[in-house]
Amino acid sequence: MELPDVQSSLPEVRINLTRVGVKNVQKLVEVARPGKRPVIFISNFDVFVDLPGSLKGANLSRNFEVIDDVLQQAIDGDVNEIEELCSAVARKLLDRHEYAERTEVRMRSKFMVRRETPVSETSCHEVVNVHAKAIAQRNEGDPIIRKSIGAEVTGMTACPCAQNIMKDHALHVLENLGVAEDKIEAFFNEVPMATHNQRGRGFLCIEIDDDQHISLEKIIKILKDSMSARIYELLKRGDESYVVMEAHKNPRFVEDCVREMARKVIAQFHDLPGDSVVTIKQTNEESIHQHNAYAERKATIAELVSEMDKGTL
């Protein structure tokens, strides 16, 4: 006896659905690298297709089959980047869901990075939150695919405003103690003033066409270098002194971090097409306030270049 295909039957309410699929599909992703050890990601996938009003349901088992097929390609070395992996899944979903006009794949991963502390060169690890996305739109011939790659990194920021207040206070104290003006200036040049700090979380995502490539390592570096200082899981005394001094020599508002990321994106990825979309977010968890500070910018590469040329960034 042949079972009825319930998914292909007519629904009672015949409207199109924007997204139908599965969320939080957990997979271990192994991406091969030529001449190097493979990169391992602990990943969660969200996989969707659109559904016409003439169908009661989507065949969700096809989503799992496609993910497994593409993950095997990554192990075999046919897919070398996680955004390419999402793109490959989105493309295959269109093949397997012949009724779909649009497919979407999201991937959230934990990426373990080996680090060395700045002074003692002690080895430690850092977990970076990585995400990728691809959207495929059916078209005559090849589908139109847009993909994105991004990361979220934690760092340290030092408040410029409070630092100026403390510097002004120290100046009056030193003057009252009779310290010469040139000595005061020399002291300030060597020892940055105290200020309150924040743990900052920087987010950077770049959306590109399917034939473009973005280095995840470069995105992570931009994030780390756009705050006052990097932070580490393990610090010896010399390392701790270095990190604190580095942060206080480089005070930044939450707005400064976002603008610095934008500047570094343009410098690093200047060859990207102008319609590439950059999303930058920074959240600073305040130490002396009960609220957090936040700044954001979303723009195309062309828009950022135009503003920088005008001197607004």
From Swiss-Prot:
Converts GTP to 7,8-dihydro-D-neopterin 2',3'-cyclic phosphate, the first intermediate in the biosynthesis of coenzyme methanopterin. InterPro entries: GTP_cyclohydrolase_FolE2/MptA (IPR003801), GTP_cyclohydrolase_MptA (IPR022840). Belongs to the GTP cyclohydrolase IV family. GO terms for biological process: tetrahydromethanopterin biosynthetic process. Signal peptide: none annotated. It is an enzyme of class 3 (hydrolase). It catalyses: GTP + H2O = 7,8-dihydroneopterin 2',3'-cyclic phosphate + formate + diphosphate + H(+). The record marks 159 as: May be catalytically important. Pathway: Cofactor biosynthesis; 5,6,7,8-tetrahydromethanopterin biosynthesis. Binds 1 Fe(2+) ion per subunit. Its cofactor is Fe(2+). It holds the Pfam family GCHY-1. One of its GO terms (molecular function) is iron ion binding. Transmembrane segments: none annotated. The gene is mptA. This is GTP cyclohydrolase MptA.
